[in-house]
Amino acid sequence: MKRFLISAALLAAVTATIQAHTLDGSVKDNKTGEPLIGTVIRVKELPEVTTTTGLDGTFTLHELPNKGKFTLIVSYIAYKTQEIVVDVAKKDKLDIPMTEDQKELGEVVVTGHREYRSDRSAVETVKAAGNVLNVISQQSIQLSPDVNVASVLQRVSGVTMERDASGEASYAILRGMDKRYNYTLVNGVKIPSPDDKNRYIPLNIFPSDLMDRLVVSKSLTADMEGDAAGGVVDMVMKDAPSRFQLQANAAIGASDYFWKDGRDYLTSNRSDYTHKSPYEAFGSEYKASMSDFKNGPMQVKSHSAPSPNFIGGISIGNRFWKDRLGVIVAGSIQNTFRGTERTYNSVKMASGEQAMYISKLQHRYYSIHDLNTGVHAKLDLTLPGHKLEWYNMYVHTNSKGIRYSNGIGTEYIGENSYTQDDEMRSTSTTQSIFATNLKGTHHLTKDFTIDWAGIFSQAKEEDPDRTYATLSNTVTTDNTEGDAVSGSIWSPNKTISKTYPKNAERRFQHNRDTDWAGYINLTYNTRFGNDMEAIWKTGGQYRRKERSNRYYSYIFNPADTELTLDDNSLEQFGHIEWTCRTPYSQASQLNYDSKEHIGGAYAMVTMKSQLGEVNVGFRAEHTNQIYTMLQHFRNMGQVGEQSYWDYLPSANIKWTPTQKMNVRLSYYRSINRPGFYEIVPYQIQGEEYQEKGNPNLKRA
């Protein structure tokens, strides 16, 4: 009986589906015949059956009974709503002409709000701009698979991305000019960099789903800061929507790098590491021992594959108090695992020779775990003639990584043997940027406007217990093609006859940049007739930057210099006993504090007409840089200072011969200031080569 009832129910469902009727149709203007896109068609007797017309004005109604008469309700903005009775047994297609709903009004008040998120708005912004720029809208960003700003920038013409050693895009190169020749803004305000060496900002730490649009300026006007020969990247973050809006996104995936050829994902025990150097924890007179250094970074393990990647974001916003007050809060998280490999060759010049030669071959494997989070919140208050905006942003990234390198010195390769160094580097680097700013715009008269901004921002980088350890191997080979000397590090033909620990280093470095800045601009419009106007603008800015940089390094030798390891596996790094060769840390010129004061003032005028636009301006900037090294060094001054003025003219011409064409010509003068890392007289062995600062370095 039970089977019979189930079969009967299924048969009834199938019969109903077969008997369902489909009605096609089109909706057009009864005078012009133009298709009316988005017309709503509902069935009065069946409220659940509804549809809208497509781009060609056609529609299809599904799930109608096979017999009977029904009333269609057809509605479209500015047209009269119609009710049409249709006998579905006699009609398969229906053409519906719509009549305009004309009414005579005594007064019409039109209010508008520009939607900056759309592609159309981006095109209009580029078209109307007085200087050369590109804009990517939020609509394009949402449709793309890009998860951070660096990936989005790759889609802009004239922009290429510089990738870090692990292969990820990080810095923008605008118009072919190096990353140091551009700067980054958030909502039109410059922010500091967490980088320990330079002013430029790694753009891969900013989640793309927090952005409203991305603006890339390829020429400067006088009201823009002058240290950008290449251009400016402005990240305009999400604004409060015109009505309640809740958006969320989530994605999961995995890197196929670790699935190919059986590659392993490498990790170290970063939960057990030394948070502070002994120098900072116990003072400059403290003699460090091995008990002060935890062994977690040395405990390297391999896994067949990492956990899946996860990316998610959410934003919520609304307007209150008769749309005067807007609020939006958004957050993002990106938890990703990635890997890559690359070859790096060191070069030298032989004594008395003019040619370089490769002195060392290295094949490097990277396993990286990135955790990026971002939060932003914005409030805006709009009153007649006035607008206040308070914006807050915090982005944070933690990158844990293992770099495993096999290196071969070409100078000491024997006929059947050579030395191979296996180096392990374990890192856990944290970067963060916090910015808060208050902006005001005041239309005091119809033609006179004042806008101002006050900003506090801070960028930090912490890189504690960066660990390097090297094993040295004596390798024998049958010298056949395809062995390590020929380029294949993992050749099955080689035999490791001896492995012993060589040396180790542990570095502790961190830096902090703190900025206070203020801006003010005054704008006055003058009209000449009906088709020409002049926009006069003047203003100034002041920024105070404070930077602290700390760097401590400890060198280690194996406790047993005659120790020979059983093999060169990854686990061997955690079993070696070391002794500290530099228990008081190495004195470094990279322990310094610095200050920078930048003031600027400008004046410019923009002439607009139907033929185009001319912008002419002049900017003056004063720079004062001071650094103080915390330690004394022979033949070196402990304090250094630079102070100078720069005068920067600019001109932008836009000719509009037709409504669909702009011809642009730009001229501007800019500067490039050295970073503190470059003018402090330090000298260290960097990742790839020896680095040295130059206190006499001038701006360009």
Tell where the protein language model's regions lie, with residue ranges.
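Short, acidic, small-residue-rich periplasmic hinge/interaction motif at the N-terminus
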Residues: 28-32, 39-44, 73-79, 89-142, ...
